[in-house]
A protein has these predicted regions:
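Extended amphipathic ligand-handling, pore-lining, and cofactor/metal-binding catalytic surfaces
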Residues: 149-223, 366-437
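Tubular lipid-binding modules of the TULIP superfamily
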Residues: 2-157, 161-164, 213, 217-375, ...
Length: 443
């Protein structure tokens, strides 16, 4: 039985003619079959054409603290492009949505680590270095992908996917002092959150989604809307536009209220957490130094904007609206820092600018209650890219400029983004509380 029979129970969906419903039911099975086959063939083609360097996908360096311990992960890279295998795929043209389950197999991230202890640095200045290898076993991606119509083709835009590994194994390798003996220590956990992988998990998921998008977009764009739907393609375009208008109208209303709340709270500019890093001198000097930054700032939350059209999905139980926001102006820096190494003492300011960022927003309206219950399901930075860091006052320690950028990005990903997400979440929850969301969705 065609799944479209439930659409009569959908509260907010625009009516579809019987002709379009019949056409959707007729073309969907073949579309799904062709898309799965073309997707796998595109994966084989990319694998055959890719050079070795194209299979490595670099990740940003990581800086984080555990108690008094400061840990850096450097030169991180996903060691191969995943072999995406579709376990299931279903298309819902009435909602312009793909439902997918994709097997990515085992993924491996490798890099170097350096561990220091801030307290010991004053009494017993030691540093521990080595290699780290994190393996994500049997990773599965499940969820929905939003489609839009562009000219005579479909394009995929929003990925509401959950990546779940069966196990996560962290392997640390290092050599004993004055010895060629290699030591290996390993731990395994079922959840990413219980391992060091959490520090780069968001960026890794963004990398995986981008790789998936390239492969999927390359094949779905080949499907002709006119050939699939014939005379009914005009009605489908109109319907798709109505879904976009509903989603955008709700998001824009909540966004306007949330931004007003941010401004009224004086939260356009937030305080950034202190930055404290222990570092080694340039070879051959192995003496340690210390850099500490204070009076940090993050701005400007009042520049939150909708990046593009949002996706709208509805079934008999709920409505889901999802897509991406960004901060048009995103600055993060410190008015003052102090650094010391051997006899050199330096100080100045650190100013960072993030030119590209995406914040995934997902709203749900449950229809299982007497009144529609609106909830903020997700607010999460998906990507931060094109980052510029300018450091003043380094003087004789000018060779540290690249390191400072690395530390800034590490602190940004592991501490600053969490602060921003919490503030945005609070503002949207306030907006939802005082807004009649169902009324906005009803024409």
């Amino acid at each position: 039985m065609c799944s479209l029979t439930i659409s009569q129970q959908r509260t907010f969906e625009m009516f579809l003619s019987s002709e379009l419903r019949e056409t959707i039911c007729a073309v969907t099975p073949k579309f799904e079959e062709n898309l799965k086959r073309a997707f796998q063939n595109e994966g084989f083609r990319r694998e055959n054409l890719a050079e070795k360097k194209d299979r490595l996908h670099p990740l940003d360096d990581v800086l984080f603290t555990v108690g008094d311990n400061i840990i850096e992960l450097r030169d991180l890279k996903l060691t191969k492009t995943p072999d995406f295998r579709i376990s299931s795929l279903s298309a819902d043209f009435s909602m312009l949505t793909l439902h997918v389950t994709i097997n990515l197999g085992n993924l491996r991230v490798e890099g170097d680590y350096e561990a220091n202890n801030k307290t010991l640095q004053y009494f017993f200045p030691i540093v521990h270095t080595g290699k780290v290898r994190i393996t994500f076993e049997n990773v599965i991606a499940t969820g929905r992908i939003g489609m839009f119509i562009k000219e005579d083709s479909f394009i995929v835009e929003h990925y509401d996917l959950t990546y779940t590994p069966r196990d996560v194994t962290v392997l640390v390798l290092y050599k004993e002092e004055s010895s060629d003996i290699r030591v290996e220590n390993e731990i395994s956990r079922q959840k990413v959150e219980d391992t060091i992988a959490l520090t780069f998990w968001l960026e890794l998921k963004d990398t995986l989604t981008n790789l998936l998008h390239r492969q999927l977009q390359a094949v779905i764009v080949e499907e002709s809307l006119n050939e699939l739907f014939g005379e009914n393609d005009t009605e489908l375009r109109t319907h798709a536009n109505q879904l976009v208008l509903k989603a955008n109208r709700l998001v824009d209303s909540l966004l306007c209220t949330a931004k007003s709340e941010i401004v009224s709270e004086g939260a356009r500019i937030l305080e950034a957490p202190h930055l404290s890093v222990i570092f080694k001198g340039r070879h051959p000097c192995q003496q340690q130094g210390l850099l500490e930054a204070r009076d940090g700032y993050i701005q400007d939350l009042s520049t939150l904007s909708r990046c593009n059209n949002f996706s709208f999905y509805e079934n008999e139980k709920e409505v889901i609206v999802y897509g991406c926001l960004n901060m048009r102006e995103f600055k993060y820096g410190y008015e003052h820092y102090n650094g010391r190494h051997v006899k050199a003492l330096v100080g100045g300011s650190i100013r960072g600018m993030i030119y590209r960022n995406k914040i995934f927003l997902k709203l749900s309206l449950s229809k299982s209650h007497e009144h529609c219950l609106t909830q903020l399901e997700t607010i999460q930075f998906r990507s931060v890219n094109d980052i510029e860091v300018i450091v003043s006052g380094l003087g004789s320690l000018s060779w540290l400029a690249r390191n400072v950028k690395t530390w800034m990005i590490g602190n940004l990903r592991n501490e600053v983004l969490i602060i921003l997400e919490n503030k945005i979440r609070n503002a949207f929850e306030y907006a939802i509380e005082i807004t009649d969301c169902p009324a906005i969705l009803i024409d």
